[in-house]
Amino acid sequence: MRACDLLKRIKQHYRRSRTNPDATMSLIDHLTELRTRLLISLAAIVVTTIFGFIWYSHSIFGLESLGEWLRRPYCSLPQSARADISPDGQCRLLATAPFDQFMLRIKVGMAAGIVLASPVWFYQLWAFITPGLYTKERRFTVAFVVPAAVLFAGGTVLAYLVLSKALGFLLIVGSGVQVTALSGDRYFGFLLNLLVVFGVSFEFPLLIVMLNIAGLLTYQRLKSWRRGLIFAMFVFAAVFTPGSDPFSMTALGAALTVLLELAIQLVRLHDKRRVKHEALIADDEASVIEPPSSIPERSYTATRSHDDVT
């Protein structure tokens, strides 16, 4: 029944959008719209979370199980850097409480669900904002959702590649004196934090481009802020990177600097196109019509000479 009610509300929303092209909405309509889009986002996250919960310990569509895939950076470390607590000599993480494994599986499944459902809830977020924009600005909906999902995925991939280097530095530094026995909760918590920080950070250049498209940020201003923004990227990486190891901090700062420069160049091209477009519009405008001038009075001398000839 709830699914049917949700589909009815969605149909009513799209019916209203066809009959109300100006998108004028009352406060109640705005709240209804927000509730509908939140329900759609939550439904997508629930479905993908269930998928992630199953994928955690099972191979799906020929893919390796999510748990093995996430554990690989830790297991790739030398055996001298991690505690050998498994009787069969296999790489295992430590569980210190009865419900650790179950709760960890839920956390990992939920994190995977949020990432897999990111195209859906990114679209719902932007679609809720677009009624306050002009019609031409709504065309950028798809252009916002697709790059946002790609950038988030790119950030998580970079974080995964950096993870083994970060763990190698953090765990091998004092391996001559002590050995690290990581619990599953601590390890996956560190991993998920790293993935989220990298994924969210990669959205910053997209935010710059969207502010420029909205007319709130220009290339000249970004050009004057370039050095300060690059410095801010590395400060952000140093403060928010989990573990504070030099590998992850440098990787995040360098990646954000490259993406920032790419965003600045896109803003420069967009501003050039905007100036050319405004110049064409100015040329197409009608010229100002001057008021008519008065006709000079007929000369009396010229009239008389004409009469003499006739």
From Swiss-Prot:
Family: Belongs to the TatC family.
Tagged with keyword Transmembrane: yes
Quaternary assembly: The Tat system comprises two distinct complexes: a TatABC complex, containing multiple copies of TatA, TatB and TatC subunits, and a separate TatA complex, containing only TatA subunits. Substrates initially bind to the TatABC complex, which probably triggers association of the separate TatA complex to form the active translocon.
Record keywords, A-Z: Cell membrane, Membrane, Protein transport, Translocation, Transmembrane, Transmembrane helix, Transport
Pfam families reported in the protein's UniProt record: TatC
Organism lineage: Bacteria, Bacillati, Actinomycetota, Actinomycetes, Mycobacteriales
Compartment list: Cell membrane
Molecular function, one GO term: proton motive force dependent protein transmembrane transporter activity
InterPro entries: Sec-indep_translocase_CS, TatC
Protein name: Sec-independent protein translocase protein TatC
Function noted in UniProt: Part of the twin-arginine translocation (Tat) system that transports large folded proteins containing a characteristic twin-arginine motif in their signal peptide across membranes. Together with TatB, TatC is part of a receptor directly interacting with Tat signal peptides.
Bilayer topology: Multi-pass membrane protein
Main localisation: membrane
Superkingdom in the source lineage: Bacteria
Keyword Transmembrane helix carried by entry: yes
GO biological process: intracellular protein transmembrane transport; protein transport by the Tat complex
Transmembrane segments: 38-58, 109-129, 142-162, 190-210, 229-249, 250-270
Gene Ontology CC entries for this record: TAT protein transport complex
Span list, region Disordered: 291-310
